[in-house]
């Protein structure tokens, strides 16, 4: 096993490495979105190298990261991350609405996303939701819940990733397919010190009560009776 403890550079962002590897052969380490959030994992490259990734705790691998470079053979081990597409909901329009309308829409949007158990991150007046079902179904959920006035589109996950902090990337892309993960939806109003309204996914449980969650990432294994 080859131990990888440091990232040498990034062939997609660093001009020096772009020039150095211009004619190199890439041995890709292909990771899905969950694997990319781990600072420690073991996986083989496309050419069969047994790689043990052991990075600092808060270091996250990015698409194009160079993990190893052999000048003699002109071969570089490079990370390729396959991210899910993302639905982007634009909340800017809500700034023109009354406070009551803003609160109502944010609550209803959080409830709709929460009932679907879709992960979500809000940033810069947008909501990012990774695709876990067909786009037609996500489109249907938005329209049947009356959110036609909120523009939304579908983009590649790689387009959204640079806008996110490491913790936001872990929340959005780390295990997006887990249906028991709660949704966190914040206010469309950007406050300088993180203040403002925060609306979270709400769940109705078999024991007859419902609840919302504070702003933290956690998983629960329990049965739900959803009310739509």
From Swiss-Prot:
Region feature Disordered, mapped onto this chain: 193-228
SUPFAM superfamilies cross-referenced by the UniProt entry: Urease metallochaperone UreE, N-terminal domain
Keyword Mitochondrion: no
Compartments it resides in: Cytoplasm
GO cellular component: cytoplasm
Alphabetized InterPro entries for the sequence: UreE, UreE_N, UreE_N_sf
Organism superkingdom: Bacteria
Pfam families documented for this protein: UreE_N (PF02814)
UniProt-listed GO biological process terms: protein folding
Gene Ontology MF term list: nickel cation binding; unfolded protein binding
Parts forming coiled coils: none
Biased composition (Basic and acidic residues): 204-228
Gene3D superfamilies: Urease metallochaperone UreE, N-terminal domain
Function: Involved in urease metallocenter assembly. Binds nickel. Probably functions as a nickel donor during metallocenter assembly.
Family per similarity comment: Belongs to the UreE family.
HAMAP family in the record: UreE (MF_00822)
NCBIfam families, alphabetized: PRK13262.1
Protein name from the UniProt record: Urease accessory protein UreE
Species: Yersinia rohdei
Classification of source organism: Bacteria, Pseudomonadati, Pseudomonadota, Gammaproteobacteria, Enterobacterales
């Amino acid at each position: 096993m080859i131990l990888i403890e440091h990232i040498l550079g990034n062939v997609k962002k660093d001009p020096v490495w772009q020039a150095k590897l211009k004619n190199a052969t890439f041995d890709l380490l292909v990771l899905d979105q969950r694997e990319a959030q781990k600072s420690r994992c073991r996986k083989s490259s496309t050419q069969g190298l047994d790689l043990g990734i052991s990075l600092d705790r808060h270091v996250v691998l990015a698409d194009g990261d160079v993990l190893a470079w052999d000048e003699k053979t002109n071969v570089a081990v490079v990370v390729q991350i396959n991210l899910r597409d993302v639905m982007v909901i634009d909340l800017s329009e809500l700034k023109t609405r009354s406070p009551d309308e803003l609160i109502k829409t944010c609550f209803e949007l959080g409830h709709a996303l929460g009932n679907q158990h879709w992960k979500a991150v809000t940033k810069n007046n947008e909501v990012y939701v990774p695709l876990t079902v067909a786009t037609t179904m996500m489109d249907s959920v938005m329209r049947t819940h009356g959110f036609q006035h909120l523009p939304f589109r579908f983009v590649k996950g790689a387009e959204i990733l640079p806008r996110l902090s490491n913790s936001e990337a872990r929340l959005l892309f780390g295990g997006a397919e887990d249906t028991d993960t709660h949704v966190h939806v914040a206010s469309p109003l950007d406050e300088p010190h993180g203040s403002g309204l925060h609306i979270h996914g709400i769940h109705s449980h078999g024991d007859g009560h419902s609840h919302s969650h504070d702003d933290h990432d956690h998983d629960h294994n329990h049965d739900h009776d959803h009310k739509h």
